[in-house]
Structures are given as C-alpha cells and as structure tokens.
C-alpha cells in the first residue's frame, strides 16, 4: 500500500513551470567516491568476490526476453530514456562511469517494476531519477535537480517529484547503488593485458570506458556478465582479442571463471559496432574519465598495443 501511495504521489509539471518553490533544501552536492579505483596491491580475492556477487547487480533473468520479444513500449521507453541520459551526461560532462551506473539502475528497475503504458512522462522522470542517483554516487559535483534536466525535455519535474521517484528506485533496487558494472573491472583487466602487469595509462582507460559506454546500450549486451564485458573490452582495446589465451600462466586465476567463447563473442560484437565509437562518446568524457581517478601514467613506456 505504501508503494502504491508513493507511485500515486509522483507529480509532473509542464516545461513552463515557475521555478519558485520547486527546490526543497536542494544545493549542489559534492561527493568523492570512486566507483572504479582498484589499486595494484588489491588482492585477486577481492576481484573474484566481485565476480561472484555481480549477479546481484543485474536485471532480472526475463528482462532481456521481454525486450527481445518485441515489447514496444519497453523497448522504445528504454531507448528514449538512455538517449536522454546520454545527452545529459554530455551536457554536464559526466564521465562514462556515471552513464553506466544510470543505465544499470534503469535496467534493474524496469526489470522488476512495470510502469503504466502510455505515460511517457513517467519514463522521463525515471531517467532523471536514475541519472541523479548515479551522479550523486560517481560525480564530484552534482547540479540541482532542475538544472539536471537538459535537452529541451517535454516535461520538467519538480525536485520533490524526482526525489520521490529516487526513493521508489532505491526501494526496488534494495538500496544497492554501488553496482558492479564493466567499468568496475576494466583497470584490473587492462593491467593483466600488459606484459609486466603494469598500471594502464589514462588514455587506455579512457578509451576502454568509451567503448563500454558506447556499446553496452544495446540490449544484446544484457545477456553477458559485467566481468565478461570488461574482459572483452580490455582484450579488444589492447589488441589481444584474436589471441585469447586464458590458460596463460601470466594471467590471473580470475580468467578461469570466464567462458572464453562468450568473451570472444562480446569482443566481436564490439568490433562489429564500428570503429568510430570514440567519436560517438559524449563531449568531455576523455577529460572527465581521465581526471576522476589518480592513475599512474606510463604512456612513454606502454607495452600495450593500441588500436588505431
């Protein structure tokens, strides 16, 4: 009953609403919590534990079946929501990790909660709420909710409406916002791709994050685990996709938990999406992703093979 009341209380206002009174105790938030920051000294056991727990941060099993079965409202709604989140990330110069978190929240929510059909404003409100939550987790500076809503949307929502939707999302996700995404693993896998287990360069990490954000919007990637996607991206970007050798003694025991053919399939899907992924990535992603973390750079002596 409480959940029904919460849903019924969601309000929507047209885009010409008066700003007066819309913001309730809302000021820009500054948070510094890196979502992907594994140091070289962190143990294999921690990463392997993440692999074991990553399923807790995925959409329900029947979600991709519903998307593939031709559920038009769900497909179109998801696409429009992700397109808006992408544009908002571009405008606010949020990094690809923020986009991936927002997408994760959106998919997990839609997989367990049916929204009423024919009410596009609810999906728009959901998109705003998911991006707001992701930004609070990942970004160091978060705009006020009214300022977050960019791109000339059909609807602009009061802060209290977004906050109510945020609460509904939090309840449905069981408050698990520190989601494990492909971004969570990418630095680790890139390091394992190097010849000397060296720290990857900012450039290589940025490029990998671009590929993750650019490609995983497609529904076909939902059938794969975040660790599998991260491994495939690391292999692809480092030029090792065609030489997948998980049994190599220099590789981590973690690779024994991955299915070689599934990882290779993801890599082929990524490469088939085209070579202009970076040009499709939101403006500012390179700058934001490079400065979000304190990486050691080894550009001058990198032993990685960069794709041209």
Swiss-Prot record:
<dbReference type="InterPro" id="IPR004367">
    <property type="entry name" value="Cyclin_C-dom"/>
</dbReference>
<dbReference type="InterPro" id="IPR039361">
    <property type="entry name" value="Cyclin"/>
</dbReference>
<dbReference type="InterPro" id="IPR048258">
    <property type="entry name" value="Cyclins_cyclin-box"/>
</dbReference>
<keyword id="KW-0131">Cell cycle</keyword>
<comment type="subunit">
    <text>Interacts with CDKA-1, CDKB2-1, KRP4/ICK7, KRP5/ICK3, KRP6/ICK4 and KRP7/ICK5.</text>
</comment>
<dbReference type="GO" id="GO:0051301">
    <property type="term" value="P:cell division"/>
</dbReference>
<comment type="similarity">
    <text>Belongs to the cyclin family. Cyclin D subfamily.</text>
</comment>
<protein>
    <recommendedName>
        <fullName>Cyclin-D4-1</fullName>
    </recommendedName>
</protein>
<dbReference type="Pfam" id="PF02984">
    <property type="entry name" value="Cyclin_C"/>
</dbReference>
<comment type="function">
    <text>May activate cell cycle in the root apical meristem (RAM) and promote embryonic root (radicle) protrusion.</text>
</comment>
<keyword id="KW-0132">Cell division</keyword>
<keyword id="KW-0195">Cyclin</keyword>
<dbReference type="InterPro" id="IPR013763">
    <property type="entry name" value="Cyclin-like_dom"/>
</dbReference>
<dbReference type="InterPro" id="IPR036915">
    <property type="entry name" value="Cyclin-like_sf"/>
</dbReference>
<dbReference type="InterPro" id="IPR006671">
    <property type="entry name" value="Cyclin_N"/>
</dbReference>
<dbReference type="Pfam" id="PF00134">
    <property type="entry name" value="Cyclin_N"/>
</dbReference>
């Amino acid at each position: 009953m409480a959940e029904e009341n919460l849903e019924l209380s969601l309000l929507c206002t047209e885009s010409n609403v008066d700003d007066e009174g819309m913001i309730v105790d809302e000021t820009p938030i500054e948070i510094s919590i890196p979502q992907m920051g594994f140091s070289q000294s962190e143990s294999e056991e921690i990463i392997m534990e993440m692999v074991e727990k990553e399923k807790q941060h995925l959409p329900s099993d029947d979600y991709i079946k519903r998307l593939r079965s031709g559920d038009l409202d769900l497909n179109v709604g998801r696409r429009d929501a992700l397109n808006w989140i992408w544009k908002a990330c571009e405008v606010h110069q949020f990094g690809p990790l923020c986009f991936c978190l927002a997408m994760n929240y959106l998919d997990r929510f839609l997989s367990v909660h049916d929204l009423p059909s024919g009410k596009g404003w609810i999906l728009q409100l959901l998109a705003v709420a998911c991006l707001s939550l992701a930004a609070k987790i990942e970004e160091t500076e978060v705009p006020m909710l009214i300022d977050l809503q960019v791109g000339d949307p059909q609807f602009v929502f009061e802060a209290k409406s977004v906050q109510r939707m945020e609460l509904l999302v939090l309840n449905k996700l069981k408050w698990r916002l520190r989601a494990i995404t492909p971004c969570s693993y990418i630095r680790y896998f890139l390091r394992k791709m190097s010849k000397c287990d060296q720290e990857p360069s900012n450039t290589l990490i940025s490029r990998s994050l671009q590929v993750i954000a650019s490609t995983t919007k497609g529904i076909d990637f939902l059938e794969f685990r975040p660790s599998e996607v991260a491994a495939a991206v690391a292999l692809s970007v480092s030029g090792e996709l065609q030489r997948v050798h998980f049994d190599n003694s220099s590789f981590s025991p973690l690779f024994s938990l991955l299915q070689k053919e599934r990882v290779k399939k993801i890599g082929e899907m990524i490469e088939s999406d085209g070579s202009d992924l970076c040009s499709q990535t939101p403006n500012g992603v390179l700058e934001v992703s490079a400065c979000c973390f304190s990486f050691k750079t080894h550009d001058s002596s990198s032993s990685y093979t960069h794709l041209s």
